[in-house]
Amino acid sequence: MRTAKFATLAALVASAAAQQACSLTTERHPSLSWNKCTAGGQCQTVQASITLDSNWRWTHQVSGSTNCYTGNKWDTSICTDAKSCAQNCCVDGADYTSTYGITTNGDSLSLKFVTKGQHSTNVGSRTYLMDGEDKYQTFELLGNEFTFDVDVSNIGCGLNGALYFVSMDADGGLSRYPGNKAGAKYGTGYCDAQCPRDIKFINGEANIEGWTGSTNDPNAGAGRYGTCCSEMDIWEANNMATAFTPHPCTIIGQSRCEGDSCGGTYSNERYAGVCDPDGCDFNSYRQGNKTFYGKGMTVDTTKKITVVTQFLKDANGDLGEIKRFYVQDGKIIPNSESTIPGVEGNSITQDWCDRQKVAFGDIDDFNRKGGMKQMGKALAGPMVLVMSIWDDHASNMLWLDSTFPVDAAGKPGAERGACPTTSGVPAEVEAEAPNSNVVFSNIRFGPIGSTVAGLPGAGNGGNNGGNPPPPTTTTSSAPATTTTASAGPKAGRWQQCGGIGFTGPTQCEEPYICTKLNDWYSQCL
């Protein structure tokens, strides 16, 4: 947490029974609009807002302005135990621009890396899209697609401008945990597949037991408990490298873990927890194409990028494929093809993940935690959208943009980006690139094909690199396309059966019909 101290106003306390919310600084969520689309390609603007994660907020006594947490340490005279700390301390409202470097404009969100405020220096931020004042906006991604624009031109080696989904409670844990009185309005309830133990309040209690300040982060530490849930990394990136990664968990929603049994980054036993901390990642550089993503490359990171991610069902209605493509300069750019022998393809499937783990010699915790099918269960349920900017005190972000492990050069899968292995040291990045920022904008969500219906050059995602005319936009479902039966393979229920550039089966197994959703995507329904 990046602490701030404001010592002039009187606290306005919401409750005196548990983890509190105070208002020495009035909480005003910055507005951020997004678009909800229908199968016909019609999109409706949703006027929404964002909130800041509670871990970044000023935590002080409910009776005044004395810090409960300063630097990376708790005040044990106030916080004698987990429950009394939650009772005596509150998280406060945020001055989004001046303290945290967070600004919005219409459908655009900018997150600045380092912000020097009147009382503190803030590093990084984590924000959530809201549905009203007191709930997070949730998305059910399975069978749908999610699209956004991003500008990573101003974030380099060692930084991560991330957009992802986690299975956290829509109310921030307010209804499940009586000790939590702050809720989603104040950014509570975070969890992810690393089962992070640096969260200050978990399940409505302070994570004070066993808390140890970090040796290389003056603002963070780790406690006895962690908080776990399924995670779908749509976008982890800087201007040198990018990856998208599903992380299944055997327990989908938020759950608390203890000590090394949490697994993940914060524990000595990385794979001991209920979640897969590694996931099954698609990083174009790691998959052999070193000229696809970067400055002046096929996907040019000096310009704004439109990122489209589709979550396609298989014949059984489970998650079958995660497909990615890009739009830039008015044309579709299919995701790069993997050139690793035995790991061909440009999308994530169960078979692709199986082959990648073997080719790279990685521990296959992905399958241990349920693989694509288990990830699909999370995607079928409500997930919360997270947008953040951060540096990495554990491994200098080398796992994203350099060679990792650093002594594994030449080993299949070790080279993930062109950044030097000496890059990404947080103290250096914070000193040398404080004005770095990432901009997310033009968020769109809806059925397959709906979010790109109006985009110039939007063809079949991942199958056609040309520039076909934009699809026809209608307000009703397109008529079913019927074909004459003939020999050959047939697509199962939910599978793709047609579209611009599609080369697979165009007939469906009985009794399903190949139904045109738009010019570039037909599906067996």
Swiss-Prot record:
The keyword Glycoprotein appears for this protein: yes
Question: Bias regions of kind Low complexity — which residues?
Answer: 473-489
What superkingdom heads the lineage? Eukaryota
* UniProt GO molecular function: cellulose 1,4-beta-cellobiosidase activity; cellulose binding
Recorded GO CC terms: extracellular region
Q: Which residues form the signal peptide?
A: 1-18
| Spans annotated as Catalytic | 19-467
Classification via InterPro entries:
CBD_sf, Cellulose-bd_dom_fun, ConA-like_dom_sf, Glyco_hydro_7, Glyco_hydro_7_sf
Enumerate the Gene Ontology biological process terms: cellulose catabolic process
Q: What class of enzyme is it?
A: hydrolase
Could you tell me where the Gly residues compositional bias lies?
456-465
List all disulphide bridges recorded for this chain.
C497-C514, C508-C524
- What family does the Swiss-Prot or TrEMBL record give for this protein? Belongs to the glycosyl hydrolase 7 (cellulase C) family.
Q: What does this protein do?
A: The biological conversion of cellulose to glucose generally requires three types of hydrolytic enzymes: (1) Endoglucanases which cut internal beta-1,4-glucosidic bonds; (2) Exocellobiohydrolases that cut the disaccharide cellobiose from the non-reducing end of the cellulose polymer chain; (3) Beta-1,4-glucosidases which hydrolyze the cellobiose and other short cello-oligosaccharides to glucose.
The protein here is known as: Exoglucanase 1
Biological source species: Humicola insolens
Phylogenetic placement of the source organism:
Eukaryota, Fungi, Dikarya, Ascomycota, Pezizomycotina
Q: Which gene encodes it?
A: CBH-1
